[in-house]
Amino acid sequence: MIGEDDELQGLTPAEAFRHAKVEHFLGHARDYADMGRYLAGLKVLDAVFGLDPSNEEGKLLKGTIDDTVAHIHKRTTNGKREDADGIQARPRRSDLVMIVDQDERLLTSLTGTLRRYGFMAITASSYDEALETFSAFRPEVVISEVNFETGPKGFDLYLWLKTSPGNQDVPFLFLATRIDRETLIAGKRFGVDDLIMKPVDDDVVIASVINCISRRRSSQIRA
């Protein structure tokens, strides 16, 4: 069996360094795909192809991400679709949830949980990435950390969403390790749909997501 050390034999130092960078980027791209950071994964793969345009593993991974993104874009989210039993407001398998948090382990864990319950999931790890991801995919629900370590905070994302045309009724849930009284009052005043404390209980997250989607869909039906 030919191992990685055998593959590196005969490479010049520059070629070996380039190979190491490619493997490093591929590792990040795989991780991003697993946690639902598809836009970040595609950007990292661009770096892979800049170093190795014919990289087969990169091509396979890009194909997988492209297929997933296409599937997300094809979901049906508009209109009042009535199920066979006449219940219109229940969540659908096509419902997309966006999670925003700087903890990549949490992103991977929650993405897996949502998928197991039949939802689609996308993620972002910063305010700017969240804006780009939301604009690209238009999720049905947003779950965001309250306090990012750097940059704009979760409330900034919430206010951006609620002041963007057509997005005012998108449910928004906050994640928090701890929260002060002023932030809690502000969240209630501004109309945040729910606050979920960390460490996250998967059942609580799923129940909150289902409840928010059902409430939103019921109001759309009444309208």
Question: What is the meaning of each model-derived region?
Answer:
Residues 155-156, 179-197, 204-207:
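Alpha4 helix (beta4-alpha4-beta5 surface) of REC/receiver domains from two-component response regulators
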Residues 153-168:
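Short amphipathic alpha-helix used as the core "switch/output" element in two-component signaling
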Residues 137-148:
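Active-site beta3 strand of CheY-like receiver
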Residues 118-126, 133:
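Short hydrophobic/Thr-rich beta-strand motif most characteristic of the beta2 strand and flanking loop
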Residues 93-105, 110-114, 141-142, 205:
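Conserved acidic segment of CheY-like receiver
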Residues 71-73, 210-223:
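The C-terminal output helix
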Residues 15, 19-22, 65-90:
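Alpha-helical linker/edge segments of TPR/alpha-solenoid repeat scaffolds
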